[in-house]
Amino acid sequence: MAAKSQPNIPKAKSLDGVTNDRTASQGQWGRAWEVDWFSLASVIFLLLFAPFIVYYFIMACDQYSCALTGPVVDIVTGHARLSDIWAKTPPITRKAAQLYTLWVTFQVLLYTSLPDFCHKFLPGYVGGIQEGAVTPAGVVNKYQINGLQAWLLTHLLWFANAHLLSWFSPTIIFDNWIPLLWCANILGYAVSTFAMVKGYFFPTSARDCKFTGNFFYNYMMGIEFNPRIGKWFDFKLFFNGRPGIVAWTLINLSFAAKQRELHSHVTNAMVLVNVLQAIYVIDFFWNETWYLKTIDICHDHFGWYLGWGDCVWLPYLYTLQGLYLVYHPVQLSTPHAVGVLLLGLVGYYIFRVANHQKDLFRRTDGRCLIWGRKPKVIECSYTSADGQRHHSKLLVSGFWGVARHFNYVGDLMGSLAYCLACGGGHLLPYFYIIYMAILLTHRCLRDEHRCASKYGRDWERYTAAVPYRLLPGIF
């Protein structure tokens, strides 16, 4: 359910000649073949409670001014019943259904029908037709990278409407926020169910499918590795980036417009949240080609975790800071605002530079300079399913010599900055940093398990050279 996926441990060479042998791929690619009781319990818990968590947070803002304990206190003390809270919840509306259908259709058209032109005039930007990483079955998919273009065109239309056309109010997203939640849930469940049926009956690449024999695990974690319709519509790339992440900045802009409508001004806290989160969104689309080598594309299958998560969890819970500031227009002191800005920018610097170091190392096969020096590497090897031996390199210089996942530290610093922009009045806006800390720690451990299975003793040499996973001296 993450908006910003993270790269695997930096490697200089891709995986060639790989087949979908169960023994070789179980620890290296994709999700598990078999399900232990803890994983199954976790899956069932998320399927049951994740939709409720989203509803609870949004309802708490709508009915209790973002006080998370408000609904519980009212129910326990008898001041309200669950039926009372539900009765006050706005239902799905025709307007919301029309808006959401138009939105998703527009993003599908931008994704499938408009080849990228940004790479033709933006120096350093890599777009157009690009290859992804090799799959467990040895397939190398091609992708139409045009996310930055879609983001730019979408926001150009948004600002044209706000300042010239006046087709709709900039507050339209906030004004229909809960009715749109039901629409997003319908799409999330529909695409997840379709992906599961497709995996059973007409998969894009049957050799990349995984079945556990457990319905709930298959539904949540997915069966197909890269489900597609036609040549270019890739479920993973579309739903991870569009409609959720393109919408992220639009949602924040709508929240800012609502704050101005209600309070006659936009606070510096709202400006900070909009600017800092926009930096990460633009970075995501500027580096969309790099994203093809991240854990979401290279490891995760497409199921409810990605389908529903990207439609509902991401746009509704990653934007809680902006929503909170509509109800609580926090105006930060100058030192507080400067501190939040610096924390966010330093976090982004670490996040971007660490990923750039890894990408540069991979593209040049280690023939580069990192922090002005020739990079130190751990030479390693692994055997693929066809018995072929491959050689690779693990980077131990730059930020990757500080900790094995130091890019996550930058991500966490940025996440904390969003939350601190909201002051200390309520817990709700701090959900994001709590969630990201859990998510990135889990990803860190999952990636390390996969790399240990792949590289064996060479991985032990690497962990000896870089002893800390995330925080030097701590973890």
UniProtKB/Swiss-Prot annotation:
Q: Which GO terms describe its biological process?
A: cholesterol biosynthetic process; cholesterol biosynthetic process via desmosterol; cholesterol biosynthetic process via lathosterol; positive regulation of ferroptosis
One GO MF term on file is:
7-dehydrocholesterol reductase activity
Q: Which stretches of sequence are listed as region Disordered?
A: 1-21
How would you summarize where this protein is expressed among tissues?
Widely expressed. Most abundant in adrenal gland, liver, testis, and brain.
What InterPro entries does the entry give?
ERG24_DHCR-like, Sterol_reductase_CS
Pathway recorded for this protein = Steroid biosynthesis; cholesterol biosynthesis
Gene Ontology CC terms: endoplasmic reticulum; endoplasmic reticulum membrane; membrane; nuclear outer membrane
Q: Please state how the activity of this protein is regulated.
A: 7-DHC reductase and cholesterol-5,6-epoxide hydrolase (ChEH) activities are inhibited by tamoxifen and the selective AEBS ligand (4-benzyl-phenoxy)-ethyl-N-pyrrolidine (PBPE). ChEH activity is inhibited by oleic acid.
Write out the transmembrane intervals. Answer: 40-60, 154-174, 177-197, 266-286, 306-326, 331-351, 420-440
Ribosomal protein is among the record's keywords:
no
Localization in the cell: Endoplasmic reticulum membrane
Query: Topology in the membrane?
Result: Multi-pass membrane protein
What are the EC numbers?
1.3.1.21, 3.3.2.11
Residues the entry annotates as binding NADP(+): 358, 362, 395, 400, 407-408, 447, 451-455, 462
* PTM sites of type Phosphoserine: 14
Instruction: Give the catalytic activity.
Output: cholesterol + NADP(+) = 7-dehydrocholesterol + NADPH + H(+); 7-dehydrodesmosterol + NADPH + H(+) = desmosterol + NADP(+); 5,6alpha-epoxy-5alpha-cholestan-3beta-ol + H2O = 5alpha-cholestane-3beta,5,6beta-triol; 5,6beta-epoxy-5beta-cholestan-3beta-ol + H2O = 5alpha-cholestane-3beta,5,6beta-triol
* Main location as per UniProt: endoplasmic reticulum
- UniProt KW keywords: Cholesterol biosynthesis, Cholesterol metabolism, Disease variant, Endoplasmic reticulum, Hydrolase, Lipid biosynthesis, Lipid metabolism, Membrane, NADP, Oxidoreductase, Phosphoprotein, Steroid biosynthesis, Steroid metabolism, Sterol biosynthesis, Sterol metabolism, Transmembrane, Transmembrane helix
Q: What is the effect of changing residue 93 to M?
A: In SLOS; loss of 7-dehydrocholesterol reductase activity
Quaternary structure note: Interacts with DHCR24; this interaction regulates DHCR7 activity. Interacts with TMEM147.
Illness: Smith-Lemli-Opitz syndrome: An autosomal recessive frequent inborn disorder of sterol metabolism with characteristic congenital malformations and intellectual disability. Children with SLOS have elevated serum 7-dehydrocholesterol (7-DHC) levels and low serum cholesterol levels. SLOS occurs in relatively high frequency: approximately 1 in 20,000 to 30,000 births in populations of northern and central European background. Historically, a clinical distinction often was made between classic ('type I') SLOS and the more severely affected ('type II') patients.
What family is this protein classified in?
Belongs to the ERG4/ERG24 family.
Its annotated function is as follows:
Oxidoreductase that catalyzes the last step of the cholesterol synthesis pathway, which transforms cholesta-5,7-dien-3beta-ol (7-dehydrocholesterol,7-DHC) into cholesterol by reducing the C7-C8 double bond of its sterol core. Can also metabolize cholesta-5,7,24-trien-3beta-ol (7-dehydrodemosterol, 7-DHD) to desmosterol, which is then metabolized by the Delta(24)-sterol reductase (DHCR24) to cholesterol. Component of the microsomal antiestrogen binding site (AEBS), a multiproteic complex at the ER membrane that consists of an association between cholestenol Delta-isomerase/EBP and DHCR7. This complex is responsible for cholesterol-5,6-epoxide hydrolase (ChEH) activity, which consists in the hydration of cholesterol-5,6-epoxides (5,6-EC) into cholestane-3beta,5alpha,6beta-triol (CT). The precise role of each component of this complex has not been described yet.
What's the protein here called? Answer: 7-dehydrocholesterol reductase
List the source organism: Homo sapiens
What gene, per UniProt, encodes this protein? Answer: DHCR7
